[in-house]
Amino acid sequence: MKTIHDIRRSNARKLRDGVGGNSSFATMIDREPTQTSRFMGDGATKNIGDSMARHIEKCFDLPVGWLDQEHQTTNITKKPDVSITNKQITLVPVISWVQAGAWKEVGYSEVDLSTAETYPCPVPCGEMTYILRVIGDSMIDEYRPGDMIFVDPEVPACHGDDVIALMHDTGETTFKRLIEDGTQRYLKALNPNWPEPYIKINGNCSIIGTVIFSGKPRRYKIKA
């Protein structure tokens, strides 16, 4: 059974990842990164006490006691303010690339939110937003394997947006940049060494989501 300290540490880590890492989190709560690492790093040596828990909640504009509870849904009753721009945060789930292909149709019915890995999205997003971990190297150097991309299916894609597309012939999802040139539209791989960097859109695919934010976990390892 998880202890209160386990729950607090897990929630703090999600907030940390949502704002871009330990340094940003430390700035948010007006502490040194070395101090925050001691209570939520991989080798944490301290627990998050009551006063620190309440301090973190206050800095993120969260209800008192939020850090003490496990959160099994994608919604936070009171969305935290994590920047001076007052952007809202919603917890969203990490899903597979296969699930992404049918997400608009099945959505959360395909994900057990009680066990799903969820993270706060630092920018305003729709209720259907999800997270994918980048695989492959077609979008290097801007995106690397293991990077987390937050995808909102409800945001219309425009020229220059990075998008998730469903290929009709294979049923597979792909991650590329949308290029519009006059009346023509293309999917572009950002890797300059990619053998076929452009895919012409001619009814062969559907754009099913727009990337609205990305993050780079520093300790994530690709599973073999």
Swiss-Prot record:
One of its GO terms (molecular function) is DNA-binding transcription repressor activity. Gene3D superfamilies: Umud Fragment, subunit A. Keywords: DNA-binding, Repressor, Transcription, Transcription regulation. One of its GO terms (cellular component) is protein-DNA complex. InterPro entries: LexA-like, LexA/Signal_pep-like_sf, LexA_repressor, Peptidase_S24_S26A/B/C. CDD domains: S24_LexA-like (cd06529). Pfam families: Peptidase_S24. The keyword Plastid does not apply. GO terms for biological process: negative regulation of DNA-templated transcription; SOS response. SUPFAM superfamilies: LexA/Signal peptidase. The keyword Transcription regulation applies. This protein is part of the e14 prophage present on the genomes of E.coli K12 MG1655 and W3110. PANTHER family: LEXA REPRESSOR, LEXA REPRESSOR-RELATED. This is Prophage repressor CohE. It comes from Escherichia coli (strain K12).
